[in-house]
């Protein structure tokens, strides 16, 4: 469905991971893969401040000050990626974090999706994290999917073949950047 839920945001998943690790329900992760940006690009009315701050602006504030901010004070995508990733880096210092940009979608204007993906990629660069550019490299092409549904069921969500191909692609890309 095209409805947003707070359970889909990365921060809530991070909170659950931290809580589960603290309570012994989950071991400390060695690898954290964050796939983000699709809803940020898809729902501009619900997320009007997503592109309100550049990556450079999001990284102006020193870490010592930025780390004391609360989740509700980080509104732009660049600030959110910085906040979430630095929190994970602080709590799980031995885990490798890999960021995934969103795949192309017929439901999202290409320029908006690419702006979101570029923001995520630049944040990854600033944080020295590996980034997999699904918007550029995955099997899903919005232009092709507009003509015929090759790898998606609806122009956004992968079908069986799209999931299989993208799964192989992600496995290859992520295994190539593993640091252990």
Predicted segments with their positions:
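Extracytoplasmic/secreted proteins, especially bacterial periplasmic and envelope-associated proteins
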Residues: 12, 16, 69-72, 76-83, ...
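Active-site segments of SGNH/GDSL-like serine hydrolases
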Residues: 38-39, 82-117
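Catalytic His-Asp segment of secreted/periplasmic serine-dependent ester chemistry enzymes
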Residues: 103-180
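Conserved SGNH/GDSL esterase-like catalytic core that processes O-acyl groups on lipids
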Residues: 1-75, 79, 157
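Residue-level preference for short coil/turn positions at secondary-structure junctions
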Residues: 25-28, 93, 125
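A short alpha-helix capping/helix-coil boundary motif
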Residues: 63-65, 93, 97-101, 144-146
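N-terminal cationic-hydrophobic initiation segments that often serve targeting/anchoring roles
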Residues: 22, 88-90, 178
């Amino acid at each position: 469905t095209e409805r947003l839920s707070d359970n889909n945001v990365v921060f809530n998943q991070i909170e659950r991971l931290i809580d589960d690790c603290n309570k012994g329900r989950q071991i400390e992760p060695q690898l954290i893969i964050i796939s983000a940006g699709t809803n940020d690009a898809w729902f501009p009315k619900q997320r009007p401040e997503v592109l309100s701050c550049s990556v450079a602006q999001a990284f102006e504030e020193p870490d010592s000050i930025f780390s004391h901010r609360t989740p509700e004070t980080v509104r732009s995508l660049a600030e959110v990626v910085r906040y979430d990733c630095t929190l994970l880096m602080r709590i799980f210092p031995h885990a490798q974090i890999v960021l995934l940009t969103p795949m192309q979608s017929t439901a999202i204007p290409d320029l908006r999706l690419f702006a979101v993906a570029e923001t995520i990629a630049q944040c990854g660069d600033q944080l020295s994290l590996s980034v997999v550019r699904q918007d550029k490299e995955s099997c899903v092409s919005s232009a092709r999917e507009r003509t015929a549904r090759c790898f998606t069921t609806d122009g956004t969500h992968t079908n069986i073949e799209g999931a299989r191909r993208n799964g192989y692609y992600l496995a290859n890309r992520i295994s190539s950047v593993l640091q252990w």
